[in-house]
Amino acid sequence: VRSSRSRIPESLDQVASVVEKLAVLLAAGVAPTAAWTYLANSPSDVNDTVTAVAKRVESGTNIADTILHRMDDAAERARGDDWQANGRRLSRRRAAPTTAAANEAAWRGLAAAWFVAIEAGAPLAPALREFSSSLRALAQARRAALTALSGPVATAKLVVVLPVVGILFGVALGFDTVGTLVATLPGLVCLVTGLVLLWAARVWNRRMVRAATPTDLTPGLVFDLLAVAVSGGASIDKAKSTVATAFERSGCAVDSDGVVEVDGVFDLSQRAGVPAATLLRSEADRIRREASSAAERKAATLAVALMLPLGLCVLPAFMLLGVAPLMLSVLSSTVGGL
């Protein structure tokens, strides 16, 4: 059974490319249903999601609902794949959002944007073009965050194996460090304590990495969708209700702080006589920039914070599992030779 990664594009840039090409086709006068069909038959854009959506919309199914149905199916199959693979679905759900999760959020965002454009009477092509630009900015921010995290994550994985290296080093020197660990009382104490410290270090590292990984998969999306709604001529109240419905239908996460800021943007627009759509898109860009900067700051902080489990857990475990058995073996051989 294929994993969910094969069912949706592998990067946000690919999702953005699909959205941008849809915008170009629609701007050229191609009907929405035909646009999806053309993309599904294009070798450069073939993927399971586009193909599945194209097949369903040909029968007259609502496009936004079709995208959401496809995402629900992919998520359900992914859950089944995870259970069949190793039964660790629960731990994966608690982990930080993966690239596949970010891509799924992008597709759900597309469904929400499509729904808002249709309901608000906004032209689909400009709305999708703006959304594709938002996805590319989001992809860039996510790449920057993951790049900043790569160093600390590699460090966290590397330091955990240091105690094992210590044990192998003792064996290479000709000492029975393994026998000392499992066959003597002091060795067993060192073994149990060292393993507990290693387990604590691994849990600690994973929690810190998870806390430093961006969790908002679609920052600024609420402002993007409101910009689409008001650009179609919808009133402020109508735009808010339409976007709220779109979020509820699509399952996208709503940032409560962003919802509060929306009123300030509309108030500024009315007082200054500036188009609300322009201000909303500007606010969405600002939120994405801040999210990217925050992710980079967390990654930089993580590089320092990882020294805590290294000093408090890994190094003591290294002493208990690598150095202490070696010393015990030396003492044992020395005493035995007297």
Ranges and model annotations:
Residues 1-75, 79-95, 190-253, 259-268, ...:
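Juxtamembrane/interface alpha-helical elements of multi-pass membrane proteins
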Residues 29, 121, 273:
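Conserved G/P- and acidic residue-centered "switch" motifs that form tight phosphate/ATP-binding loops
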Residues 83-105, 112-160, 277-313:
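Membrane-interface, cytosolic juxtamembrane amphipathic helix immediately N-terminal to a transmembrane helix
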Residues 108-112, 222-225:
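Short cytosolic helices in intracellular loops of multi-pass membrane proteins
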Residues 130, 203, 207, 211, ...:
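Membrane-spanning helices that line or support transport/gating and their immediate boundary helices
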Residues 144-202, 296-338:
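Bilayer-spanning, highly hydrophobic alpha-helical transmembrane segments
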Residues 238-296, 301, 308, 314-332, ...:
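C-terminal soluble domains/tails of integral membrane proteins
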